[in-house]
Amino acid sequence: DCLLIAVLSHGELGMLYAKDTHYKPENLFYHFTADRCPTLAGKPKLFFIQACQGDKLDGGITLSNRTETDGLSSASYRIPTHADFLVAYSTVPGYYSWRNTTRGSWFMQALCDELRYADSDRDILTVLTFVAQRVALDFESNTPDMPTMHQQKQVPCINSMLIRLLVF
């Protein structure tokens, strides 16, 4: 069991836009913390957010070469209220998030592809590492008529508070 919420919208640093309002991403998570939503306590809560986090561009660089803690077990235990969250943003704070007008956002394309082909023994953080690799290496903006927007790059930003492996 897990909760998965995907938000595909416009945004800027610390703000997401809806049709009739704007809100902070934290407002999405707030209602699902263990103290506010006990039925989801101990269950993974995944948020995939496809939105700009600013207007900075990443021109990338060219490289010449590519190159669990032990604890006492107990019948009952306490967890932090923000445990078991994972938030995957399509880009790093302050930066533009790219999309193809025909195929959609780079992040969602890569996420869907990696989830579709993921082995059942691959945990979500491994899957998201491959998503980040795919977005970073396989995509580049192609707008030769707009030189400042041409050949730009992107990399997702993954924030994990998961306290166990999650495999689909």
Predicted regions and their residues:
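Cysteine endopeptidase catalytic domains of the caspase/legumain-like
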Residues: 1-168
